């Protein structure tokens, strides 16, 4: 069995790391490079950087901080935000990122997934999906979630989009469960389990981590390949070395720190 991945998520706005609750009310958490170095030293398996202002503002990710991070860390990292064309993705990868993630641009232009997979290989292409449960009980996709004033509700069912994104060439899916985001009440096991049944590529859970047991639960019950978290890591409520030891005690395979 492959080792499960622990992935700190760093939401970036105006060159700083921020964190919100249910994608709103963001507060400053610190410098990008300082946090990246801390997580590298603590044994994170990978980092994900979301430039949350890029897509809502119609701009591409700021390559300068990508280059800064790439010069200083030696663990894989993925960059998301405003990557709406192949050349933008090429520039991000050239700046040092290992993978690129697309979310809102893929919803506007699904063929972008295929174009990126053809240009760089599916292993470089992550599709992020922001999902929320609506009144009828269905999970549906949200677009432009980096700015609450520009967030759009789409009729597209989350599970349908997971299937379609894979067909188009996604090499990994990150499912951001918005109802759970930032509230630390646990990952959305029900939604992630249904996604897992449809997902033939690596699936990463996002949204809801509040304690170590939540990580064990999402690996055991939803069988995800990776667990992404932000606030519990940024605040120091959970330290990665201790979390890895806890997971090993739960018979979950993780890489050494």
From Swiss-Prot:
Subcellular location: Cytoplasm
E.C. designation(s): 4.3.2.10
Coiled coil: none
Listed name of the protein: Imidazole glycerol phosphate synthase subunit HisF
Gene Ontology biological process: L-histidine biosynthetic process
InterPro entries according to UniProt: Aldolase_TIM (IPR013785), His_biosynth (IPR006062), HisF (IPR004651), IGPS_HisA/HisF (IPR050064), RibuloseP-bd_barrel (IPR011060)
Entry annotation: catalytic residues: 11, 130
Matches recorded under Pfam families: His_biosynth
Keywords tagged on the record: Amino-acid biosynthesis, Cytoplasm, Histidine biosynthesis, Lyase
Subunit structure as annotated in this protein's UniProt entry: Heterodimer of HisH and HisF.
Purpose: IGPS catalyzes the conversion of PRFAR and glutamine to IGP, AICAR and glutamate. The HisF subunit catalyzes the cyclization activity that produces IGP and AICAR from PRFAR using the ammonia provided by the HisH subunit.
GO MF term set: imidazoleglycerol-phosphate synthase activity; lyase activity
Main location: cytoplasm
């Amino acid at each position: 069995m492959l080792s499960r991945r622990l992935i700190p998520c760093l939401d970036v706005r105006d060159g700083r790391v921020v964190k919100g609750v249910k994608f709103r009310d963001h507060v400053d958490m610190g410098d990008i490079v300082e946090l990246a170095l801390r997580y590298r030293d603590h044994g994170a398996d990978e980092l994900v950087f979301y430039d949350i202002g890029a897509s809502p503002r119609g701009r591409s990710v700021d390559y300068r901080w990508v280059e800064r991070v790439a010069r200083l860390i030696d663990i894989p990292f993925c960059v998301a935000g405003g990557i709406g064309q192949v050349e933008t993705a090429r520039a991000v990868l050239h700046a040092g990122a290992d993978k690129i993630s697309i979310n809102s641009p893929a919803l506007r232009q699904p063929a972008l997934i295929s174009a990126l997979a053809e240009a760089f290989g599916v292993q470089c292409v992550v599709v992020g999906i922001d999902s929320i449960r609506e009144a009828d009980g269905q999970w549906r996709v949200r677009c432009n979630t980096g700015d609450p004033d520009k967030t759009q509700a789409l009729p597209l069912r989350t599970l349908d989009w997971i299937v379609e994104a894979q067909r188009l060439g996604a090499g990994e899916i990150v499912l951001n469960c918005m109802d759970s985001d930032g509230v630390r009440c646990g990952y959305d096991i029900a939604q992630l389990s249904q996604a897992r049944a449809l997902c033939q590529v690596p699936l990463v859970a996002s949204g809801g981590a509040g304690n170590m047991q939540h990580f064990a639960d999402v690996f055991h019950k939803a069988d995800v390949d990776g667990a992404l978290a932000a606030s519990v890591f940024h605040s120091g409520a959970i330290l990665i070395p201790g979390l890895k030891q806890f997971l090993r005690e739960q018979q979950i395979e993780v890489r050494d720190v």
